[in-house]
Amino acid sequence: MATFDAPSDLSPDSAGSYAGATRSTVRTADGVELALYRWCAGQAAFPPKATVALAHGLAEHAGRYTPLAARLGEAGIELVAVDLRGHGRSPGPRVWAGSIDEYLRDFEALLGAATRSRTPFFLMGHSMGGTIAALYAAERLAHGAAHGQRPAGLILSSPALAPGRDVPRWMIAASQLVSRVWPRYPAMKIDPALLARDSAVVEANRNDPLVHHGPIPARTGAEILVAMKRIERVRAALDLPVLVFHGSDDKLTEPEGSREFAREVGSADCTLTIYEGSYHETMNDLDRARVIDALIEWIAAHSG
């Protein structure tokens, strides 16, 4: 597995797909300097009507959410995101997580940078980022606040909350063993063709130099499975308003995991939407306009 660090150039005119973002860095509790991006809301909405703190998915980076940021900005909503350690322009071995708690520290640092006094803010995560956001909210924010402010809600886009239905139990157990004895074993690759039905999205991903196209190390995959089990144990305590959406034809994360989470979460205000025919990235798929419209509507309804 490649262990190179990301480019250090974070100047406003540096290359990368972060159009419109204000760039800086934020330091985690364990001393990692993460690349931080803030897409401001439209000029007519300052301060913004709401702020969304986003954790991206495995092997991608925050810049892929620039189109989402533009749509949110039109609605007066600010988007703030980091490149998780080992992703995008943040330092560290590519897509390596010695523990899922490393990503939780990244998310904690993001929230510290994203929260504004008197502005409603939302936790959001896509795919593995959804795992991180859900685990953080359930373990650390049940009946509590983040940086002195209680989040207005939790938004999960195609979250990785359960192993695939076709994955046998022995394979899950074997992944834990391999993670211990050969943690950097190249376990799998992500096929861009499974992201969306839009060929332009697939090709853009294939050609994006900040996306990790190599194999995912066994330890990282095993730690995501560990996070799933931790979420199962604590989800009943999660009392924030929750929005979960997933594509019915997602082959990268399990839609049934979202259904089960919505049934078992402690929140009395949980909305689940399964988009028929959509692949993994519903916000980039052919029906993305209605997906993002529904997201904006939900945020607006929970920002009062």
Language-model regions: role of each:
Residues 126-216:
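Alpha/beta-hydrolase-fold enzymes
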Residues 269-304:
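Catalytic active-site module of serine/aspartate enzymes centered on a nucleophile-bearing elbow/loop
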Residues 59-62, 88-117, 291:
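Catalytic nucleophile-loop/oxyanion-hole region of alpha/beta-hydrolase
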